[in-house]
């Protein structure tokens, strides 16, 4: 994580580019650790006052937030958009609060500038919302888990339009919380608290639920923030005459495992062995457009662009297969790397179709150009909204102040997971 800090255009990048041009050779500059702390964009310096209103049934009716946000010494790329726009939208959380008022005063100080960095305003918004929910539960004498359950957006209410711009696409917050409570043995906590007290220790348990907006991608959002940029992603899928595949993606990998996950997408989609798939990224001489890796967007946006390009490859392959198999295009099915005439055993492998595309002796020239190489762009209309519930159980020695995290439980809904090992 933390790749949002790479969005910002640092002065050193411009100087290194200039130096490389002057010297006509590669130039590399790397900040030392102390230099990074003094110059990299950072995040989360807020002073916040929050009020939560509830009715007689312990239902949330209003949330009011007054916030002072430190922007640092000068503006960065998305500086004000993070502690103002995104912070305000994340104050909804997973709850049905009908009225939300957020006022943020942004101030300049003598610190480094702020930008998107590890959550881009979601951690601080989640902290204040979950903290005030706990305070409300304590004041009402309610179980904090029950107060949350009572105010969650119902699973059958999606898509759910929040009062602060965002429309949530899906979610099942009751289930993620229930799973976390069961895994943490929440019901048995009081017995563990008494046992800790018998040893002279203090034991506490805390719950936090969250919503996050992944895939920083809808270009309309960039426009709303005043950024003159598109946030789409591009992909090119090139099937070679041998049947091997090269994918050129604008989502640059630097430790996320794109080479594995993107190759897995292609292997599943085209029925090609994973060892015959090459993933190319980070080369501006080969890749026309790329918006990058940040904002939890690579698989959902970059991966979807790859899927859309594969769909075009399959669509063209069906036309070629229909011509070769003397069948209607509507009767051609594609599965596991084979183009088959529906209801028959007549088929052509993807490799055969690719070879025909590049050696087009028996080819529908009136309908198609030779080659099997397709490009796609993907600009989603909305974010995706993963969610979850985390529970921490801690023990404190009141004599020394030493704190021990006895158990930490997390239940997260990430939607469809392509590669579980990378998630782990």
Predicted regions and their residues:
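Cofactor-binding beta-sheet edge motifs in enzyme active sites
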Residues: 2-175, 179-424
């Amino acid at each position: 994580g933390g790749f949002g800090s790479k969005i910002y255009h640092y002065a050193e990048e411009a100087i290194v580019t200039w130096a490389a041009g002057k010297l006509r050779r590669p130039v590399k500059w790397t900040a030392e650790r102390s230099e990074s702390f003094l110059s990299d964009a950072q995040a989360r310096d807020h002073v916040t006052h929050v009020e939560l209103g509830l009715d007689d049934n312990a239902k949330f009716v209003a949330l009011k937030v007054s916030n002072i946000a430190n922007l640092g010494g000068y503006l960065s790329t998305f500086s004000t958009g993070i502690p103002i726009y995104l912070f305000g939208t994340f104050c909804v959380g997973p709850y049905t609060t009908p009225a939300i008022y957020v006022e943020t005063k942004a101030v300049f100080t003598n610190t480094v500038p702020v930008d998107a960095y590890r959550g881009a305003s979601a951690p601080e918004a989640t902290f204040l919302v979950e903290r005030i929910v706990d305070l409300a539960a304590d004041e009402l004498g309610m179980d904090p888990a029950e107060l949350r359950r009572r105010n969650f957006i119902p699973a059958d209410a999606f898509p759910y339009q929040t009062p602060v711009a965002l429309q949530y696409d899906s979610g099942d917050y009751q289930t993620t919380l229930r799973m976390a409570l069961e895994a943490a043995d929440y019901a048995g906590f009081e017995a563990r608290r008494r046992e800790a007290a018998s040893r002279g220790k203090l034991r506490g348990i805390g719950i936090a639920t969250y919503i996050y907006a992944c895939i920083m991608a809808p270009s309309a959002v960039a426009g709303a923030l005043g950024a003159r940029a598109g946030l789409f992603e591009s992909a090119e899928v090139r099937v070679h005459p041998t049947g091997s595949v090269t994918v050129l993606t604008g989502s640059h990998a630097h430790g996320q495992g794109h080479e594995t996950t993107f190759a897995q997408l292609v292997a599943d989609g085209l029925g090609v062995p994973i060892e015959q798939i090459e993933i190319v990224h980070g080369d501006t001489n080969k890749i026309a457009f790329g918006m990058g890796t940040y904002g939890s967007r690579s698989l959902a946006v970059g991966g979807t662009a790859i899927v859309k390009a594969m769909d075009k490859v399959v669509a063209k392959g069906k036309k070629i297969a229909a011509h070769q198999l003397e069948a209607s295009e509507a009767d051609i099915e594609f599965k596991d790397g084979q183009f088959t005439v529906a209801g028959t055993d007549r088929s052509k492998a993807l490799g055969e179709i690719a070879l025909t595309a590049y050696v087009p002796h028996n080819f529908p020239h009136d309908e198609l150009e030779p080659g099997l190489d397709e490009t796609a762009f993907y600009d989603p209309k909305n974010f995706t909204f993963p969610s979850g519930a985390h529970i921490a159980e801690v023990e404190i020695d009141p004599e020394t102040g030493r704190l021990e995290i006895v158990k930490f439980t997390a239940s997260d809904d990430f939607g469809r997971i392509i590669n579980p090992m990378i998630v782990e």
